[in-house]
């Protein structure tokens, strides 16, 4: 399959909504993308395109890690969606790898994700708890993960809770 990964354009908005809706079989993630876009809280939004059709989408947005004394910025991955008929064909992996590569080039150092613990470790994600980072609401430890885009990117960072 010969697809390309490129930046989202304004013409892609309705197709991106549809991809997220169909991939998750609900509107929550599609609506989240629209809200983040409307609030200008998007760092990077990429689409996978095959023969002119958007078949996948990934979005990265700012996340604050805070405690009583400190705050620092990370990047949140999600949602990431692939049309059901194109899942398990490497499209999601290509979107994640392209996104992480571009974020690194942009100078970002830490990415967090709330996702499947069997899937995301292949991209360098590890449970966040050993790094002292927790999600703003209680979630199972194994689904909240962090990736360092640079070696030792978390060294010296203050522990805290992640907030969108």
Language model feature labels by segment:
Residues 63-76, 87, 106:
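A conserved beta-turn-beta hairpin within the catalytic core of GNAT-like acetyltransferases
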Residues 61, 95-99, 127-131:
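Short acidic (Asp/Glu) patches
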Residues 77, 82, 88-101, 113:
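Conserved acetyl-CoA-binding loop-helix of GNAT-fold acetyltransferases
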Residues 1-32, 39-55, 150-152, 157-161:
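Short amphipathic alpha-helix that is part of the acyltransferase structural core
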Residues 47, 53-64, 74-81:
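Conserved beta-strand in the GNAT
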Residues 131-147, 151-161:
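Non-DNA-binding regulatory cores of transcription-related proteins
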Residues 105-109, 114-140:
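Conserved active-site alpha-helix within GNAT-family acetyltransferase domains
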């Amino acid at each position: 399959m010969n697809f390309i990964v490129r930046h989202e354009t304004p013409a892609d908005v309705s197709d991106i909504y549809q991809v997220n809706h169909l991939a998750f079989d609900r509107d929550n993630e599609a609506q989240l993308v629209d809200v983040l876009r409307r609030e200008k809280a998007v760092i990077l939004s990429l689409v996978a395109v095959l023969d002119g059709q958007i078949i996948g989408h990934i979005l990265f947005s700012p996340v604050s890690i805070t405690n009583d004394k400190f705050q620092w910025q990370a990047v949140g991955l999600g949602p990431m969606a692939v049309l059901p008929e194109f899942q398990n064909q490497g499209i999601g992996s290509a979107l994640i790898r392209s996104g992480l590569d571009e974020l690194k080039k942009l100078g970002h150092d830490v990415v967090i994700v709330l996702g499947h613990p069997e899937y995301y470790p292949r991209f360098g994600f590890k449970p966040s708890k050993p790094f002292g980072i927790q999600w703003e609401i209680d979630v199972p430890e194994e689904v909240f993960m962090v990736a360092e885009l640079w070696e030792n990117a978390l060294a010296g960072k203050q522990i805290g809770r992640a907030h969108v």
